[in-house]
């Protein structure tokens, strides 16, 4: 392994906060290229394998679908002839993510207004109660 010793699936799982089952699933569907296995049949994750795990986790956290990631990995494996197509896929996914962020920001602002209204009503109610005790 370049740059260090190979990692077990448990170590990769802990490092990236993914279950071992999730990592196996990602490998099975081709999101992570086939991981080398040692003489005992256990996976030995290289730095490159870990790079794929980290990339997939980041993209999933950003909301990319499994299908979009499968397309991306398939294009990547075809080589440089797919560079523009990969870039286009990432641009498209970025636009979808930007729209989600915009929608979530708007929702957050609405929630803040709603919470402020509750705070205002609570303060008015407290003021009314304190006025009754005088």
Q: Which residues does each PLM region occupy?
A:
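Amphipathic alpha-helical segments within well-ordered protein domains
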Residues: 56-57, 73, 94, 98
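Basic helix-turn-helix/winged-helix DNA-binding cores
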Residues: 1-71
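C-terminal regulatory/oligomerization modules of transcriptional regulators
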Residues: 1-6, 78-134
